[in-house]
Design a protein with these regions (language model features):
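Intrinsically disordered, low-complexity coil segments
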Residues: 23-29, 111-118, 161-169, 193-194, ...
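Ordered core of a single globular domain
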Residues: 196-262
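Long, contiguous amphipathic alpha-helices that act as assembly "spine/axial" helices in icosahedral shell
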Residues: 87-178, 198-224, 341-349
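N-terminal alpha-helical "arm" segments
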Residues: 1-49, 354-368
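Assembly/oligomerization interface modules of large self-assembling protein complexes
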Residues: 38-113
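Sequence/fold signature of self-assembling virion shell proteins
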Residues: 236-368
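Surface-exposed cleft-lining segments at the edges of enzyme active sites
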Residues: 185-195
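A structural signal for short, well-ordered beta-strand segments and their strand-loop junctions
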Residues: 49-51, 218-222, 265-268
Length: 368
């Protein structure tokens, strides 16, 4: 067996990581809950090189601000301009060092005389899998941000300190949603207007405006927008009639009405991620809850991606596995490298979600 399949402390058990990934793929099982971009985007064929000049030339987008440069081990600090950014690719990378407590726990398991080999193996795999899911989930969360934010924010995502606190070029990725695809509600959807706002009229106006251009399959929105519609007086009257307007309206009632009348159904988007800011993990919701997004059926784009450096040239002493186009590396650092003994788990993806169907996507701004 080639040496690169093994890490310093888990040894051949690292093969279980790829085995789990493969088994889940074969069964079409979702290993990571609440990942949204994979439902709406397909991974493009990986390339050796991927830069913004190619993306800008092929798609109607303006791109700035990668997470880190393709030649960088650490985050790029500063505020370089758009022209320098065009020469870089997005590298979303997270490395998790094993705590000394967990490291000692592994050594205790390995040294235990009372534990049978099977129990040792199960405990080691559990520890190893925990680190793997943490780093892979972090990369998936960043890709969800880069998809959900522009989808719900008129095609624009700002790479600022809120979502990219580790540094990097500041700026925007703009998928240039057509101005005619964006409309505002006639009355702001606020609590003060619950008795007068006509939510369905706003929805109907969007559907009518797009009828010669696209057919919508769903209306994506934050749970708060669905709750607002269900509480509004005119929606209650529309669903139950004037004489029963005091009756509670739920999402299932609203969607039953939409289906009966051949309208797109509402789908709540629930996604919160945690952004590491120094020692703090700050919750962040990428979806702009003020906007409702009307989308056609089918995929909305692709995830452009490139081979990771260690896919092109593997290192000895490192165990590798792949979750789709996310590359996972596991390795140990010992005394010869100036360490008391630490195990690292890293996930990375050189990629960018690209919304290609923006011409068929419409936005209803419910508040300013």
């Amino acid at each position: 067996m080639p040496e690169f399949l093994y890490s310093s402390i888990f040894g051949a058990l690292t093969q279980h990581v790829q085995a789990r990934f493969d088994a889940a793929s074969k069964l079409h099982k979702q290993l990571f809950d609440n990942v949204i971009f994979e439902r709406f985007l397909d991974w493009d064929t990986p390339t050796i090189g991927l830069d913004f000049e190619e993306i800008i030339g092929q798609y109607n987008i303006t791109v700035a601000a990668p997470t880190i440069g393709d030649n960088s081990k650490e985050a790029i600090l500063g505020t370089e301009g758009l022209e320098t950014v065009k020469e870089r690719i997005l590298n979303h990378a997270v490395t998790l060092p094993m705590t000394i407590q967990d490291y000692r726990k592994v050594l205790q398991i390995l040294d235990s005389k009372s534990l049978p080999d099977k129990a040792k193996t199960e405990q080691l795999i559990k520890l190893m899998w925990g680190s793997t899911t943490t780093v892979v989930s972090s990369v998936l969360a960043k890709l969800d941000i880069l998809f959900l934010r522009p989808l719900s924010n008129e095609g624009i995502v700002e790479l600022d300190d809120n979502i990219n606190p580790e540094g990097g070029v500041r700026g925007t990725i703009n998928f240039n949603q057509p101005a005619e695809n964006i409309a505002s509600s006639k009355t702001p959807w606020t609590d003060a207007n619950l008795e007068t706002v006509d939510c369905f009229e706003d929805v109907q106006d969007i559907i009518d405006a797009a009828q010669d251009k696209t057919v919508f399959g769903k209306i994506l929105c934050a749970p708060s927008r669905i709750s607002y519609m269900c509480r509004s007086k005119k929606i209650k009257q529309m669903i139950w009639g004037t004489d029963k307007s005091a009756k509670i309206v739920q999402l299932k009632d609203l969607n039953a009405y939409m289906q009966e009348n051949s309208y797109p159904v509402f789908e709540p988007i629930r996604r919160q991620v945690r952004i590491q800011k120094g020692k703090l993990r700050v919750p962040y919701t990428p979806w702009n809850e003020k906007n409702m997004v009307f989308i056609p059926d089918g995929k909305l784009g692709i995830v452009k991606n490139a081979w990771a450096n260690n896919e092109l040239k593997q290192e000895t002493g490192v165990a590798y596995s792949n979750y789709g186009r996310i590359r996972v590396s596991q390795w140990g650092v010992g005394e010869t490298q100036g360490s008391n003994g630490v195990e690292f788990t890293k996930a990375e993806s050189l990629s960018l979600p690209v919304i290609t169907e923006m011409n068929g996507i419409y936005t209803l701004k419910t508040q300013q």
